[in-house]
């Protein structure tokens, strides 16, 4: 449920159980706001179950945090409420957590079980885990093609998608932090790259414009939302546009992925044409 709203934080859900009955549920809803464990505990308290905590088990998809960030440590909150046992789906690879939450709970005398449904929990947060373990964003390549395997025409827009598939693509966009196209797609399609057909936040718009030849009138440069332009001419920021300078003597894909890591962008949807898609595959 937190997809598209909590990045760069992971999506996390928590359930509090007392004698086989759920007494509280919660999930991380918005970046910078209360984590899943907090919402779960607050719901249980609101429902009058605070006295049951010392005999309760919390099930949480990711290791509770142990550091002060946008919010206080969830491990401290669990300890404060004397919850008896915590069952964790997967360990948090973020360097400020990475086992510290588990250690803190255990030192407080709380029983901790890890690795329950770990595969499913890793899949849930594949963007987060890719970013922190492989040190690059999670990349999704998207294209539409005709029955005879064509994805476009030279310098002209080819309409393949229908109303249903367009809404599906906008749903996908709402789940990723950034969306990337190349110069040819920007000129031929003049896309907005928003989520106007689906609820949720629009991703950061990325475009490769090596010579800075794209006209400012293109929809991708609309003032609503952030834009990053990868180019060989300049570095800097103008209004809502970040210009990120790259070179032509090394892989543009690697430079883009390194830049996105620098910007703390954990996922990118590549919606470009054949040239851009092939560069990622190669």
Regions found by a protein language model. Name each.
Residues 130-267, 275-278:
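Active-site ligand-binding patch in enzyme domains
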């Amino acid at each position: 449920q937190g997809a598209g709203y909590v990045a760069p934080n992971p999506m996390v859900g928590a359930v509090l159980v007392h004698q086989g009955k759920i007494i509280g549920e919660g999930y991380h809803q918005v970046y910078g706001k209360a984590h899943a464990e907090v919402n779960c505990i607050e719901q249980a308290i609101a429902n009058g179950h605070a006295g049951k905590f010392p005999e309760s088990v919390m099930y949480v998809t990711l290791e509770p945090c142990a550091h002060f960030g946008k919010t206080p440590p969830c491990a401290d909150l669990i300890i404060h409420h004397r919850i008896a046992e915590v069952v964790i789906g997967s360990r948090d690879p973020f360097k400020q957590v990475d086992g510290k939450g588990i250690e803190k709970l255990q030192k407080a005398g709380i029983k901790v079980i890890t690795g329950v449904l770990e595969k499913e929990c890793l899949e849930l947060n594949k963007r987060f885990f890719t970013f922190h373990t492989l040190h690059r964003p999670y990349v999704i390549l998207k294209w539409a093609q005709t029955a005879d395997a064509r994805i476009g025409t030279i310098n002209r827009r080819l309409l393949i998608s229908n109303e249903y598939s367009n809404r599906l693509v906008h749903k996908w966009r709402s789940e990723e932090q950034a969306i990337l196209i190349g110069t040819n797609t920007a000129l031929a399609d003049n896309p907005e790259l928003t989520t106007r057909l689906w609820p949720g936040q629009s991703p950061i718009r990325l475009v490769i414009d090596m010579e800075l030849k794209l006209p400012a009138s293109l929809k991708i440069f609309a003032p609503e939302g952030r834009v990053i332009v990868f180019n060989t001419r300049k570095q800097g920021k103008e209004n809502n546009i970040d210009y990120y300078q790259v070179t032509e003597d090394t892989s543009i894909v690697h430079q883009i992925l390194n830049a996105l890591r620098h910007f703390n962008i954990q996922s990118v949807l590549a919606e470009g044409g054949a040239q851009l898609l092939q560069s990622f595959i190669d």
